[in-house]
Design a protein with these regions (language model features):
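C-terminal binding/interaction regions
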Residues: 20
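Hydrophobic alpha-helical membrane-association signature
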Residues: 23-27, 68
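Short, charge-patterned binding micro-sites
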Residues: 2, 40-61, 93-94
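C-terminal structural segments of small proteins and small subunits
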Residues: 57-94
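Short glycine-/aliphatic-rich beta-strand segments at the starts of folded cytosolic domains
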Residues: 3-13
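Short beta-strand elements
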Residues: 35-42, 84-90
Length: 94
């Protein structure tokens, strides 16, 4: 099974793409390191104040994958202060 978490972020403090990269890159590194998920910026690469990031995991237990990605989402929501979540979605493919 493959599980994905897609998060649409609003980055109000970013006035340039360079600032945006400086904000998003540490978040992606931290999620990969702390939660052992694959991460990438998926969309809106040319927008200064928005980003869409994705996290992915594979496994054989849908409930575990759902729970693990919920943990990632909650961490971003509670601990990441550089922006806010506009929308989030978890999908599981079997």
């Amino acid at each position: 099974m493959l599980a994905t978490l897609t998060i649409h972020l609003h980055l109000p403090g970013c006035g340039s793409l360079k600032e945006k990269r400086g904000t998003i890159k540490p978040l992606l590194s931290r999620l990969h390191r702390e939660f052992n998920v694959s991460v990438a910026e998926l969309d809106l690469q040319d927008a200064h104040q928005q980003a869409v990031i994705g996290c992915a995991m594979i496994g054989n237990d849908a409930a575990y994958l759902q729970s693990a990605l919920e943990t990632v989402r909650r961490w971003v929501e509670s601990n990441w202060r550089e922006g806010e979540i506009i929308e989030q979605r978890i999908e599981i493919y079997s």
